[in-house]
Amino acid sequence: MKNVTHSFVFLAHWPSAGSFGLNTDILATNLINLTVVVGVLIFFGKGVLKDLLDNRKQRILSTIRNSEELRRGTIEQLEKARIRLQKVELEADEYRMNGYSEIEREKANLINATSISLEQLEKSKNETLYFEKQRAMNQVRQRVFQQAVQGALGTLNSCLNTELHFRTIRANIGILGSLEWKR
């Protein structure tokens, strides 16, 4: 609030040749400066963000490829298990008289084990994809936040140089001096 008051006092006592004291220099106004800063952030931040998202996409695609390879391996195991099951069924026909129930139990156990293995693989793949997606989103958020903070700090540091600081002090001293003479 104090800065706003000083700004209006500064405008009212502008040392120009009898003018009202409004700043007509369009390049010195905050709107243009903010537009330029936001434009630069968008221009440069877009490329960085695109590269980051492309890298994350490649990682996710490689994870999907790995999961698909694991799936193919499991399907091959399933085919081997089916072949083994066929062998067991042939042996079951031979031993049907002696131990039909034993063979049926082994068959069910084999099918259940393969089914459980496939379900676990699918669940693992889905969890991996979900966590990779969450991690990518968190990294993008963190990167954007860091860039915004760095941009703001850079803008503040570039605006607060010693020349500007001394000019502001001199102008305020001049304003206070003119107020003292009017009393």
UniProtKB/Swiss-Prot annotation:
InterPro entries, per database record: ATP_synth_b/b'su_bac/chlpt
Pfam families: ATP-synt_B
GO CC annotations, alphabetized: chloroplast thylakoid membrane; proton-transporting ATP synthase complex
Subcellular location as annotated: Plastid, Chloroplast thylakoid membrane
GO function term, MF aspect, one: ATP binding
Membrane topology per record: Single-pass membrane protein
Keywords: ATP synthesis, ATP-binding, CF(0), Chloroplast, Hydrogen ion transport, Ion transport, Membrane, Nucleotide-binding, Plastid, Thylakoid, Transmembrane, Transmembrane helix, Transport
Spans through the membrane: 27-49
Coarse class of the protein's main subcellular location: plastid
UniProt xrefs under HAMAP family: ATP_synth_b_bprime
Note from the entry: In plastids the F-type ATPase is also known as CF(1)CF(0).
Function: F(1)F(0) ATP synthase produces ATP from ADP in the presence of a proton or sodium gradient. F-type ATPases consist of two structural domains, F(1) containing the extramembraneous catalytic core and F(0) containing the membrane proton channel, linked together by a central stalk and a peripheral stalk. During catalysis, ATP synthesis in the catalytic domain of F(1) is coupled via a rotary mechanism of the central stalk subunits to proton translocation.
Record text on subunit structure and interactions: F-type ATPases have 2 components, F(1) - the catalytic core - and F(0) - the membrane proton channel. F(1) has five subunits: alpha(3), beta(3), gamma(1), delta(1), epsilon(1). F(0) has four main subunits: a(1), b(1), b'(1) and c(10-14). The alpha and beta chains form an alternating ring which encloses part of the gamma chain. F(1) is attached to F(0) by a central stalk formed by the gamma and epsilon chains, while a peripheral stalk is formed by the delta, b and b' chains.
Family: Belongs to the ATPase B chain family.
Name this polypeptide is given: ATP synthase subunit b, chloroplastic
Source organism of the structure: Triticum aestivum
